[in-house]
């Protein structure tokens, strides 16, 4: 067992005991609340995003310490292009800054960086930085940090279906070969386990087009805390709640 004396945000402290054998293999987080965090402090939204980037480092370290193998972060959705141009440009710059400032430490700690989503629309500078980080860390065996960039769950499924159809037409597979396991190989998350736990801070309770195929049996945990204020204690509380649920996967116990 892993024993922590912790507290949730500003609430009363409480003891959290985590069980190593019940640790989620894959945690996915919808990093929400940057704008609210900034507005509350009278700051521009871009400052909220910058504060949120610092939280990423904290949570990656915590996952490594706890033995969580896969961490997927919803960083930029296919719908985020609709935001004001200056905000989108600021987000692209933050991607580059994050990689330049953090990649050496991530690499030294064995973190493998990868992405899910379509990078083709990304500007050249952030795209090069991302690909460089992936190449630099490709042989690492620690936490697998997947950044969801220009990602949308519906888009991913449609893309996968199109690829399946193309392979059927080309004679590479037959219709009888198609099943859930095979279709998984046509998704961005190929080779990864489905998320055991999906966390969304900020008080919102929706999926926002995130991992729609993969979340069929995921457990969800919502928090009123905005992402820039989310910390290791909050992560442990989410895991504690997850470990005390009865996961039946559609069956009966």
UniProtKB/Swiss-Prot annotation:
EC top class, as a word: transferase
Names of required cofactors: Mg(2+)
Disulfide bond keyword on record: no
List of residues binding Mg(2+): 32, 219
Residues that hold substrate according to the record: 33-37, 45, 49, 77-79, 81, 83, 200, 206-208
Cofactor: how and how many bound: Binds 2 magnesium ions per subunit.
EC number(s) given by UniProt: 2.5.1.-
UniProt xrefs under Pfam families: Prenyltransf (PF01255)
An individual GO BP term: polyprenol biosynthetic process
Molecular function GO terms recorded: ditrans,polycis-undecaprenyl-diphosphate synthase [(2E,6E)-farnesyl-diphosphate specific] activity; magnesium ion binding; manganese ion binding
Active-site residues (renumbered): 32, 80
Summary of the function given for this chain in its UniProt record: Catalyzes the condensation of isopentenyl diphosphate (IPP) with allylic pyrophosphates generating different type of terpenoids.
Subunit record text: Homodimer.
Family: Belongs to the UPP synthase family.
Protein name: Isoprenyl transferase
Organism expressing this protein natively: Clostridium perfringens (strain 13 / Type A)
Encoding gene per record: uppS
């Amino acid at each position: 067992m892993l024993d922590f004396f912790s507290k949730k945000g500003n609430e009363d402290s409480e003891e959290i005991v985590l069980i190593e054998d019940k640790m989620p293999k894959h945690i996915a987080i919808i990093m929400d609340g940057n704008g609210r965090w900034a507005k509350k402090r009278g700051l521009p939204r871009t400052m909220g995003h910058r504060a949120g980037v610092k939280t990423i480092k904290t949570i990656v370290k915590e996952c490594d310490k706890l033995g969580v193998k896969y961490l997927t972060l919803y960083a930029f959705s296919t719908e985020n292009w609709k935001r004001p141009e200056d905000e989108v440009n600021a987000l692209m710059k933050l991607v580059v800054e994050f990689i330049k400032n953090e990649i050496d430490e991530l690499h030294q700690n064995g973190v493998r960086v990868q992405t899910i989503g379509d990078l083709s629309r990304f500007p050249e500078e952030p795209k090069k930085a991302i690909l460089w980080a992936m190449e630099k860390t490709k042989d690492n065996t620690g936490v697998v940090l997947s950044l969801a960039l220009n990602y949308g769950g519906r888009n991913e499924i449609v893309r996968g279906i199109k690829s399946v159809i193309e392979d059927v037409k080309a004679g590479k597979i037959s219709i009888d070969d198609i099943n859930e396991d095979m279709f998984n190989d046509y998704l961005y998350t190929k080779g990864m386990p489905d998320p055991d736990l999906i966390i969304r801070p900020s008080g919102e309770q929706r999926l926002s087009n995130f991992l729609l195929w993969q979340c069929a049996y995921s457990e969800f945990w919502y928090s009123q805390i905005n992402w820039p204020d989310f910390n290791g204690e909050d992560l442990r509380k989410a895991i504690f709640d997850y470990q005390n649920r009865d996961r039946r996967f559609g069956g009966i116990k």
